[in-house]
Regions:
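Aromatic- and glycine-rich beta-strand/loop motifs that create alpha-glucan
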Residues: 1-18
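Secretory targeting signals
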Residues: 22-66, 73-75, 99-171, 202-220
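Juxtamembrane non-transmembrane "cap" segments at the membrane-aqueous interface
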Residues: 178-197
């Protein structure tokens, strides 16, 4: 219980990350811009190509993701660092244990994303002359679903990578993948297939119908669940004693 409370407390570190970009503008005054546009730009960034404005999660806007990785990148893999054979000898069902850890990680991601996006939306409201409307809340909930899935998916990959390679290589591999997908997203702004498959690309998502957006979100969570299931199967067959052999 103490560990869970401590982890919840650590998530509060994202509030300065969410609010800091708006502080300088708050000291100057409000601007004539929609809350929706400011919110999308604050969270995702904006890439413009010709007459078409498309969105990808630009690298400079990934501080919230990096912070979550630093906080929870060893949430599961940390159990393998100190006498893992003794620790896991007391756990009869490895799959159930791993599934619970994934669920707890999901809960932290849900709370963390709410803090980050809530802080960002508050900052946008503080610097905009306009008020949030129906479209603002639509964008908020879409972004919220996306952020939770990305936090869970990438953090699970990092934890599994650290378990497999016994080092922080998993962290590096995950972030190399993120950067590569960012590059692909920018290089294929007008390709709907790549935009759909690539978890880091959201080209035209705000112009999609509810059904199309729902499919995209379901796809992202399918990836996260797939990684979780793979981790459960892998962990069930994993030889814990290998962790204690240098």
């Amino acid at each position: 219980m103490c560990r869970k409370v401590k982890n919840i407390g650590k998530t509060l570190l994202v509030l300065p990350v969410a609010i800091a970009p708006f502080l300088s503008q708050m000291s100057v005054g409000r601007i004539d811009g929609s809350v929706t546009g400011l919110f999308i730009g604050a969270v995702f960034g904006r890439i413009t190509e010709g007459d078409m404005s498309s969105l990808v999660i630009v690298i400079g806007k990934l501080a919230y993701l990096l912070l979550f990785h630093l906080l929870f990148g060893s949430y599961i893999s940390g159990h393998f660092t100190n006498m893992p054979s003794y620790y896991f000898s007391r756990i009869p069902h490895r799959c159930v244990w791993f599934g619970k850890q994934c669920f707890y990680l999901f809960c932290y991601a849900v709370w963390y994303a709410l803090l980050f996006l809530g802080g960002s939306l508050w900052g946008c409201c503080m610097i905009s002359l306009e008020k949030p409307g129906r479209e603002t809340w639509r964008c908020f909930f879409i972004t919220y679903a996306v952020c939770v899935s990305l936090l869970l998916l990438t953090t699970l990959i990092i934890n599994l990578g650290i378990i497999v390679w016994k080092t922080a290589v998993g962290f590096s591999v995950c972030w190399i993948g993120i950067i590569v997908m960012e590059i692909l997203a920018k290089a294929a702004l007008n390709n709907p297939c790549i935009s759909f498959i690539n978890p880091m690309s959201y080209s035209g998502v705000w112009d999609m119908s509810f059904g199309q957006v729902l499919i995209k979100i379901v796809y992202l969570y399918f990836l996260a669940v797939s990684v979780s299931v793979y981790g459960m199967v892998f962990f069930k067959k994993y030889d814990i004693t290998l962790r204690e052999v240098d």
